[in-house]
Structures are given as structure tokens and as C-alpha cells.
Amino acid sequence: MDTQRLSLRKENGSAHSLLQDQTGLKENTMNIPRDSSFNSIFGPSEVVDDAGTDRDFKHESHKFSITRAMPEKLAGKNIAPFLAKHIPEQYAPLGSHAGEPVESSGANSRYCYRHRPDLKCRRQADEPTMDKLQRIAKELETLPQRDQQGIAHAWSIFSAAPAKHRKLLLQGIMAQCCFPQLSFISASVRDLIRIDFLTALPPEISFKILCYLDTTSLCKAAQVSRRWRALADDDVVWHRMCEQHIHRKCKKCGWGLPLLDRKRLRESKRQIELRAATWDISEQSTEDETGSPAPESASSNAKRKPESDDEDTALVKRHCTSIVPRLEKEKDGDYFITRYRPWKEVYKDRFKVGTNWKYGRCSVKVFKGHTNGIMCLQFEDNILATGSYDATIKIWDTETGEELRTLRGHESGIRCLQFDDTKLISGSMDRSLKVWNWRTGECISTYTGHRGGVIGLHFDATILASASVDKTVKIWNFEDKSTCLLRGHTDWVNAVRVDTNSRTVFSASDDCTIRLWDLDTKTCIRTFHGHVGQVQQVIPLPREFEFEDHDAECENDNVSVTSGDSPAASPRGIPGLDAGTSETQSSPFGPAFDNGRPAPPRYIVTSALDSTIRLWETSTGRCLRTFFGHLEGVWALAADTLRIVSGAEDRMVKIWDPRTGKCERTFTGHSGPVTCIGLGDSRFATGSEDCEVRMYGFQS
């Protein structure tokens, strides 16, 4: 037998002696076809034909032998069982022979990431991989036929081996490698161990991972591959991103983006109602499908309260398009196809607007037409309403700048107004309030009852509150036609704000105080002291606004909060606790709020003629922050969850960060004191005694 065989005993078995003896061995001719050696590069399941020469690995108790060359017939007998055992679907297609024990292949049925059949079927070789395979094939062709067959044979054995055997083979190979070879392995493995984990993981886990990324990282992830782009651009990921940033400041990055267009919100709700009327989707309410649009609107002198809690939470409740594909396939025709905007597009649109706010990039429109100072304004969608000391109200088209109509009827200057889809209510120094159909210019009704001029009003649902020079606040109930008078201020009442959710009213007065009233008991439940000038505006912040306690910096030495009509401060400075009241009282607003009644808005913002703006916490009565920057008294104020906008006697308009107190930007342009401000998500408008209205647009 012309085959050479080397045997080493395990007690003396050192790799060193093995290497020395291997140098004298001769290769035997292997009759493996050339195409078989080439094909073995591309598939781990390719194996050598049974007729080919093979190597026999035998483990004995104290010795092992390595066969370098043997007859083809003997090699086939030794290797074929090994191949049939580990890849039976190719070498034993009809099953095992009768009487042969069948070992469990459980350990061999678990695939690693690179060899998972489902991934291998989907995986496409990229250009670097194809180039590498072609280089290996060309390099293999340069070798002698005998060497090609030997290398291909070694690859086939390794490919057919299970994980445990492969590990042993690799350990033996690396134990015999020199440093240049180990360095080559290290450099090659560095790229090979990089796995496409997003493709390997279930989509739910991939979405969870991507939700931790910021917008820049998400955009970079979308450039990796088509699969990554599909995952990174999915509505599940960007809906979460919008939840974190739109209409609120993100706690991680500090960015906050404005809400969406209220007009688009209403259109989307109408589409949903039409679809709901056409086929039954009883499990989904229309409030849960408010769509991608959300409000971007204005206020008169201050940020108006959202029309409903559903609209305010529409952003969170909107279903993602990827979650409700059923709606797109239920009916034929474009009429029944959902028209949701992708959340990434929504975020992109809002991000552009937020960036314009941050850097002051805006367009300016000037509205001229009044003949006396403008004292109040409000805008909604493309409608702007302004009231002036010339006793007129003008309705404007904000898109074209055209004056649509003029409402006449008051006998004196108009100090306040507010409108919705159906009506406009105005207050005048002639002591009356008028209700108008602003679309036609018709005066529907006139309300009288104050003994002085009406200089402030606010309505919400069926409740109207008016503030007057006669030092009182009057409540008008449109539903039951009842009225009541709230007395307590000792000077002009300049502003009022109704919160129907908690059934409370805030008022600001020239007596330098702010009061909180209970509409159920018709009593004052809180008085805030702190300003040293006449308080002109009070704005409750939206309930989504969050303020970190450690950001509070206002000194409370000159601030006092009283409960009820008592002029004394509450014990320990805790509002809602009179001198004889126990601290165990559950609600800081009194026993009327103990039975599940919603509490008033947690934060309010006020401005006064002492040139300052203050941020208050209503539950504790603390002044959390004082904003300094205006040179003269602050007449106008507007606020939302992202910013505060103020206008003052110094003819300047300032934008503030309510959390830090920093003045982010100052706008000039008016030639008279700024008397009123309307704030939207993508724009704001200012009115002045110079008879002009200036609208600043930050749209993308």
C-alpha cells in the first residue's frame, strides 16, 4: 500500500513534532473535478463526490492519525458516512438503511446567522462579496490541479461538518498558524462578524431599537440598504418621534416642534366620518383616527385653549398607516383610500417650521386700514379679525391681505374680541358686548350689564367671561341664560380666562393681583401677589406643558398667595390652606376639588406694567420664573407649550423659552406700543397703536 500515514501518541503528542513530520509527506493525486472545487467556494453545502480521494479523521482513546493520502475507494468509504450523517438530505435522500441507528440531528438543525436558510434565500451578494469570491476563484485556478483538489476537498469537509466539529477544526488550524496568518485572519474576521441585525430580528424588535435613535441617526440608517430604509422610514418609528417632539419639548434633545394645521385636521376628520358612514368600523372611533394633521391656530391677546381634548391629543391617537393597511384595501377607488401623510413627512414639515422659529427666518405681512390704535386681534386659518379704538372690527384674508368686511355698531373703542366658526363676540368701552355673524357682518345680539367699559373677554363652550373697568368679572351662561358677578378686585380687571374643564376662571387686574375663581361656588379660591405693576394679561398654559422643578429660580420673598378672600398668606406658603385648616387637606384648591373634579391648569403666565413676565404654578402658588428684558410695561402676551410671545410699551416683540427664561429673539418694526398678540404654531401677529398689524410667518 503506497499510502503514507503518520501516527502520534497522545502522551507525547505535541504539535511541534507533528509539524516536523508533516514536511516530509507527499501529496497524493486527488481525482476531484475542477468545477467541483470551484463550486465549493460558493456554497457550504457543496461536497466532494464519493469517488474522490478523502482524508480520514479518527479519534482513538490515546492517539489520533491524520490521513494525507489514500486510495479513492477507501477514501469514499471513510468520508461518505461522515457526509451522509451531517447533510443527509443530499447523501441519504431515501433515509437511513434499515437497522442503522439514526442519531438526533437537533444540534445540527440550529443555524447561525450566516447560515440560516431563510436569510440565505433572501440575501443578495453585494459587489465587495462578489469581487472577493472572484479573486479566490482566480487565485485557485493558478494553482496546480493537485493543490486545487486538496483545497476544495478541505473546504467540502469543513462545510459538511456540524458546529462542534467546525470549532475543533478551527482550533487546530489556528494553533498551527504563524503571526502573519493570524493577522490575516484578524483583518478578515473584522468585516465578517458584522451582521445585519435589523434584518435578522423580528420587525417589532427592530422598531424598538430604531425608536431610541435621533432624527439624524434615523436618516443615516435609511441609507444603509432597502431593508433598513423600509424599517427606518416606517410610521411606527416616526410616530414615536412626533410624539416626543411635536407640541412639547423633548426631554432628551430639548427640541420642540409646533402642531399641525387645524384646517387639515378638520378635513381629515370629515373624511373619516364619511368612511365610517359607508362601512362598519365600530371598533374604531373617529376620535382615534384624527389623522396626521393637528391644529395650528391663533388667539386674541393670548393663546386660545384647544377646541377639544380630542383635537389636543389627536397627534397621539392617530393610527399609523402601517398599522391599518386594511382601510386602504377595503374598498375600490381612490375615494376609500386612506389619505394619511407619512409621519416622517409630518416630522420633516414641522422640523422646518421649528428651525425657522429658532433662527428667526420668517416672512412679514402688514395689514393697514384702521384709523386708530389696534387694541385686539385674533387669527384662525386664513381669517384675521382686528378691533380698534376707531370703534370698528375688520375681517381680513391673511393669504391675500385683502380686507373682507368691516363690522360697525359699537359707539366707542373696541378693547377685546374673540371668534370661532359661527360667531364673533366683541367688548367695547361703550359698556356693551356684541355678538356678530362675522361672515355676513350682521350683529346678532347685544349684551349690557357692566357699569364700565368692557376691556377683556373670553368664552369657552357655553361660558362667557367679561372683564370691566367697574372692577368686576361677569359670567354669562349661553345655555341657561344665567349670569353672575364676581367681585373682589379693587381696580380695573384687564383680562379673564375661562377653563370649562375645571369650571374655574382666572382674572388679572390693575390692583397688581391675579385671582382664581370657582364657577360652582362663585368665590375666589386663590389670589396671587407678586407683580408690582398693573397686571395686564393672564394665560393658562396647555396641560401638556411640563416644567422641571429644579429650573425654578424665582425668589418668593415678595410673593404671597392667599386662599379665599383672606389677605393673609397661607401657612407655610401652601395655597389653599387657611390659618385654621389642616395640612392634611387633599386638594390644594379646597374641598370642592376632592371628589374627582379636574384641577385648574397647573401653570399660568402673567404680564404687567412692571416690565416683567411671571410663570406661576397654581397648585403651590410659587412664582417659578420671572422674565426680564422689556424696557417698559408689557401690554400683550401669548403662550403655548413651546414659547411665550410678549409685546410692550417699548415697541418690541420678544420670544421667550418658558423653561429657561431666555429671550430667544426680538422683533422690531412697530412705531407705537404693541398692544395685542395672536400666536399660532407657524406664525404670530402683533397689533399696535400705530394702526398696523404685522403677521410673521414661519411656514416651511
UniProtKB/Swiss-Prot annotation:
Region (Disordered): 282-313, 556-598
Biological processes annotated in GO: protein ubiquitination
Gene3D superfamilies (alphabetical): 1.20.1280.50, YVTN repeat-like/Quinoprotein amine dehydrogenase
WD repeat extents: 369-406, 409-448, 450-486, 488-529, 583-626, 627-666, 669-700
Keyword match Glycoprotein: no
InterPro entries documented for this protein: F-box-like_dom_sf, F-box_dom, G-protein_beta_WD-40_rep, SCF_subunit_WD-repeat, WD40/YVTN_repeat-like_dom_sf, WD40_repeat_CS, WD40_repeat_dom_sf, WD40_rpt
Entry annotated with the keyword Transport: no
Pfam families reported in the protein's UniProt record: F-box-like, WD40
Subunit description: Component of the SCF(sconB) E3 ubiquitin ligase complex.
Record function comment: Component of the SCF(sconB) E3 ubiquitin ligase complex involved in the regulation of sulfur metabolite repression, probably by mediating the inactivation or degradation of the metR transcription factor.
Name of the protein: Probable E3 ubiquitin ligase complex SCF subunit sconB
Organism: Aspergillus clavatus (strain ATCC 1007 / CBS 513.65 / DSM 816 / NCTC 3887 / NRRL 1 / QM 1276 / 107)
